[in-house]
Regions:
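Soluble catalytic domains of enzymes that build or remodel membrane lipids, polysaccharides, and related
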Residues: 142-377
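Hydrophobic alpha-helical transmembrane segments in integral membrane proteins
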Residues: 119-146, 169-174
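Non-catalytic terminal accessory segments
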Residues: 1-132
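Short N-terminal secondary-structure initiator segments
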Residues: 1-6, 129-141, 204-210
Length: 377
């Protein structure tokens, strides 16, 4: 749907920008600018209609580019609107612009136009880099309930947690291969995927190049997945089957003991499944005396309802860190945190901003990441 929204919004944004640019540009440049806007809109409208018939790299680039232009156009429009708000305020207060000479007024319009163009291209570059160059966030967490008072931890386990890969038109096989290498470079004992490994269609995940990359994920204690809300959007059974075909283990309201070791891993189905098990039913199967208990759940909507259940570490994704500023404000309002870690009682909650992005490889105000957790007990 993000592609449809992009085209529809540009239908309203482009005329406004064309009108404002026409107040700055000469007749010839004005026609060129309008022609460029019309050409972009027509090409992306055609691409929207036919893109599902052409599952090719060039079509993915076209669709990805359309979303880039849409979001960067929004930021550029915000600059233009902001300038006009300042003019409105000035006209009713200081009247600096109103009383200025025509040459000064025209110069101010040119500066505003250049500023909007600068914001347009700058947000494109920033949006691209924030996805394409993920950061590695290292965390250390000691399970204090398993360490006698005054003693030092004796055991260590390294978990690598990633979420929101969103395999689709935007997340290319090349990027996925680099993401897999980044994960493997951390030398994990256990690899965990927190859902939304599919964006909107399973066909892209079944690309042989993508499957080859994901099959190369390996750790001594295994690779485990949970479902996110996007897996429910199209062909759930194909998405479930894909996990086993790339060598992963899917947890749906179930518990595993990776490598038959001390760690208890709880994998919860996503909240969009209204028939998922109550958490207390799943938690009854956990053995907190065995070792650390880790809960992996895609959406952090219900983490505050876990209560006194024996969970030491909660790993979630879903938020993308807001992905597009000021989306962070809505995420914070909904979940109480955007991304990162925070203590909740005797446990720690981690919300990852994710290693991919939805719709397009575009992030402003956040960055893609993987989380490396060194557990001590």
């Amino acid at each position: 749907m993000v592609y449809l929204y992009s085209v529809l919004c540009c239908l309203f944004l482009f005329p406004y920008l064309g009108w404002r640019a026409g107040q700055v540009l000469g007749p010839r440049l004005r026609r060129v600018f309008w022609g460029l806007l019309v050409l972009i809109f027509v090409l992306f409208s055609i691409a929207l209609l036919i893109h599902r018939r052409f599952e090719a790299d060039w079509m993915s680039a076209v669709m990805n580019g359309s979303v880039y232009i849409f979001f960067s156009t929004m930021y550029a429009t915000a600059v233009v609107v902001g300038v006009n708000i300042l003019r409105y305020i000035d006209a009713r207060t200081l009247k600096l612009y109103t009383s200025a000479r025509p040459a000064v007024k025209q110069g101010a319009k040119v500066v505003a136009f250049i500023a909007a163009l600068a914001v347009f291209f700058t947000t494109m570059v920033i949006g691209h880099r924030n996805v394409r160059y993920p950061r590695v966030m290292y965390q250390k967490y000691t399970v204090k309930r398993l360490v006698p008072e005054g003693a030092q931890p004796e055991k260590r386990m390294r978990l690598v947690f990633f979420s929101d890969l969103h395999i689709g038109e935007a997340m290319t096989s090349d990027y996925i291969a680099r993401a897999v290498k980044l994960i493997q470079d951390q030398q994990p004992d256990l690899i965990l995927c927190g859902g939304d490994f599919i964006d909107h269609r399973a066909v892209y995940a079944y690309d042989p190049r993508v499957m080859a990359s994901l099959r190369s994920l390996h750790a001594p204690l295994g690779v485990y997945y949970v479902l996110g809300n996007h897996e429910y959007r199209d062909d759930l059974e194909a998405n479930i089957r894909w996990v086993s075909e790339v060598g992963g283990t899917l947890l749906r309201d179930s518990i595993a003991f990776p490598g038959d070791g001390p760690l208890t891993l709880i994998g919860r189905d996503d909240w969009v499944n209204g028939n998922r098990k109550p958490f207390e039913v799943i938690a009854n199967e956990a053995d907190p005396l065995r070792g650390p208990v880790v809960l992996m759940e895609h959406t952090p909507a219900s983490i505050d309802s876990i209560g006194d259940s024996p969970v030491d570490l909660i790993l979630c994704g879903h938020t993308h860190g807001g992905q597009i500023w000021p989306g962070q404000l809505m995420v914070w309002w909904r979940y109480g945190m955007v991304s990162g870690t925070r203590p909740v009682g005797e446990r720690e909650v981690c919300i990852s901003s994710g290693i991919g992005s939805a719709g397009a490889t575009y992030r402003v105000g956040t960055r893609s990441e993987i989380r490396v957790y060194d557990l001590y007990w």
